[in-house]
Amino acid sequence: MPRYKLTIEYDGAPFCGWQLQPTLPSVQGALEAAALATCGEAVRVHGAGRTDAGVHALGQVAHVDIPKPFRADKLRDALNAHVRPHPIAVLSAELVADDFEARFSAIRRHYRYRIVNRRSNLALELGKVWRVPKPLDTDAMHRAAQVLIGKHDFTTFRDTECQAASPAKTLDVLDVVRNGDAVDIITNARSYLHSQVRSMVGSLVWVGEGRWTADDLAAALAARRRSACGPVAPPDGLYLVQVDY
């Protein structure tokens, strides 16, 4: 069967996450229903990143085997028609080789965590960012973030229910950038542990608020103990931006 690579954007708020759940709305489930309506057969849509409940995507990638050939733009348009009214958009569809795997062929995943650093409530971006009212020292956050760059045992920063065989991951980039009230935490790596990005973000916010220093963050990493982690940032501000192959 022809295999297609899909690039997908979605608002994660209404979903239990990417992964199919029998009784809860999921991004994967909505796309598989759209694919069924498109080609008349049940198919599995495989995602590059299994985003958690409430996490958004600007450039999630998936692959799907369709029983009959489609022109790529026609497949994109059909999936978009059938996925409505869910807040999901198939940005592109591309015919790929049979051995392409959205998850296992990926060499890098890019995430951005968006914070609005102000006391005033959110009006336009509610559910899309994390509002942190206390002033953040973003220079201190960025300096501390460099402690986490490289290959480490990230046990402290992974969910206790994480099923990864090893807690070792290699973090290539972790930058903290301010533009007015907007604070972006930008990271990329080949892969991440469950809740790793949100755990790192919450701990960096403690640094920004002055509760922790860079040394405290380093000690938390070295502890290799989940209880040593700072707070886990809410899912609202997290975006899967891009997947590289």
Curated annotation (Swiss-Prot):
One of its GO terms (molecular function) is tRNA pseudouridine(38-40) synthase activity. It holds the Pfam family PseudoU_synth_1. SUPFAM superfamilies: Pseudouridine synthase. The active site is at D52. It is an enzyme of class 5 (isomerase). Keywords: Isomerase, tRNA processing. Substrate binds at Y111. PANTHER family: PSEUDOURIDYLATE SYNTHASE, TRNA PSEUDOURIDINE SYNTHASE-LIKE 1. Formation of pseudouridine at positions 38, 39 and 40 in the anticodon stem and loop of transfer RNAs. Homodimer. This is tRNA pseudouridine synthase A. It comes from Rhodopseudomonas palustris (strain HaA2).
